[in-house]
Each structure stands twice: as C-alpha cells, then as structure tokens.
Design a protein with these regions (language model features):
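Single conserved hydrophobic/aromatic residue that forms the stacking wall/gate
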Residues: 1-12
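An amphipathic alpha-helical micro-motif enriched in hydrophobic residues
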Residues: 15-23, 31-53, 61-68, 145-159, ...
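Charged mid-protein connector segments
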Residues: 54-123
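C-terminal domain-closing interface element
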Residues: 89-106, 220-240
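Charged, well-structured binding/catalytic surfaces in domain cores that contact anionic ligands
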Residues: 110-158
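A short, structured beta-strand-centered segment in the mid-to-C-terminal lobe
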Residues: 215-219
Length: 240
C-alpha cells in the first residue's frame, strides 16, 4: 500500500478530515453515516500506528496502554476509592495539578504550551483564553471586552485607510480574537455559534436558489434587490 510507505506527516491531514466527518454525521444524527465514518477514522488510527511500528516508534499495544494509564491518572475520582467523595471544585483543582504534572513531564513549563497548534483557529483561541483566565489573565467584566472590540475595530479601519494588507490581516485577526473572548464571557462557544450561523445562511441561500430556479431564472441574472427580498421571506419561511 503506497499510503503505508509514506511518513506520519503525510497522512495526518486525512485523520483530521475523518474526525470532521464523524462530527458532521453526529450533528446530522445520521447513525448509518456515523458507523461508516467511525470506521474510516479507526482505519486512519490503525494506519498511523502501523507506520509508527514500521519506523520502530511504538505499536498498537503501546497506544492502548498509554490511554489506559492516562485515564486512570486523569480521573482519580473515578478509579481511586479515596477520591470519590471529593467536591467538584476540588476535582477541578486536582485536574489542574494533574495537567501541570503532565506538562512538566513533556518539558512544557508554560500555561499555554500544550494547547495544540493545529486546532481550528476559533477553538484554539477559546482554549488559549480559558487557560490564561485560569491564572488570572482576564478582563474582569464584559464592558472591558466590548471596549477592546471597539479599539480593535478602529485599528482595523485605520489599517484599511493605509492600504496595508499585512496590517489589515493582523488587525482582523485581533478583532476575531476579541470577539471569541466576548463569546467566552457570554458563555458562547464561537466555533459552535458560527457553525450554526453557517447552517442558517446555507438554508436561506438555498431558499433563494430554489425560488429563482423554480421560475426558470438564474441567480447571476437576478437583481440584488430581488434576492434581498427573497432573503427576508426565507427568514420567515424557515423560522419554524
């Protein structure tokens, strides 16, 4: 198999794709698709492990043993008799202590060191902010977060006026990061909120497409004003 002859770095993207397809099947509540996608994800796990074994890195038993040890270590309130009566707040403190020990074992001394770089950007932003907030680096109230968004918006407008694409990209990223922070203070997961909005946009745009095509017309030949009218109709038609 040519896939097996490639290095681990060549196939990890496929693993990520399969994980997203698993998540998609779960959100659609399509259990037949979920069964198939879990199989595809498992296949990628086996692929990675086989490649690692051929390169004398580790084998499947090592993987199983590692996750078993991690589960026991991370959940003493489940696997340890003496820890089962601890309060939720104490369990959280214990969790932070355990994670700190794990980071130390990996020579990760920084609070943010083990936040995976390849996470989706919105997900990683939220994790970074939560991790920083745990050690007190956080705005005390939402008003200051809103003021920060205003500041970043002004800086983005200024960058646009100077026609510096590099600066525009930087300031736009800062604005997005601040919006994720606002969501965190409101108890909103930005990734999930945006996914919901994407689905809503898709449904409404399909309504426009179907309405126009049912009259034998083409989208690109339809005036913007008419598409906007259909958009407003779709909001009411799809609200139930």
């Amino acid at each position: 198999d040519p896939t097996m002859s490639r290095g681990l770095g060549d196939v990890y993207k496929r693993q990520v794709e399969e994980a997203y397809e698993v998540a998609d099947a779960i959100e659609r509540e399509n259990w037949e698709d979920l069964k198939n996608e879990l199989g595809d994800l498992l296949l990628q796990t086996v692929y990675h492990t086989q490649i690692a074994e051929e390169e004398n890195l580790f084998n499947f038993n090592d993987v199983i043993n590692q996750i078993s040890e991690k589960m026991i270590q991370r959940h003493p309130h489940v696997f340890g008799e003496e820890n089962r009566n601890k309060s939720a707040s104490q369990q959280i403190k214990d969790w932070e202590t355990i994670k700190a020990k794990e980071r130390a074992q990996k020579n990760q001394t920084g609070v943010l060191d083990d936040v995976a770089i390849n996470l989706p950007a919105l997900v990683r932003s939220l994790k970074l902010q939560k991790r920083a907030a745990r050690v007190g680096f956080d705005w005390p109230d939402i008003l200051q977060v809103l003021e920060k968004i205003d500041e970043e918006t002004r800086e983005l407008v200024e960058a646009k006026q100077h026609l510096s694409q590099e600066k525009i990209n930087e300031e736009f990223g800062d604005l997005l990061f601040s919006i994720v922070n606002l969501g965190r203070h409101l108890g909103v997961d930005s990734e999930e909120a945006l996914k919901k909005t994407n689905r809503k946009f898709t449904e409404r745009f399909r309504f426009i497409e179907d309405s126009i095509s049912s009259r034998g017309l083409k989208l690109e030949e339809t005036p913007l004003e008419e598409m906007e009218d259909l958009w407003q109709i779709s909001k009411k038609a799809l609200s139930n």
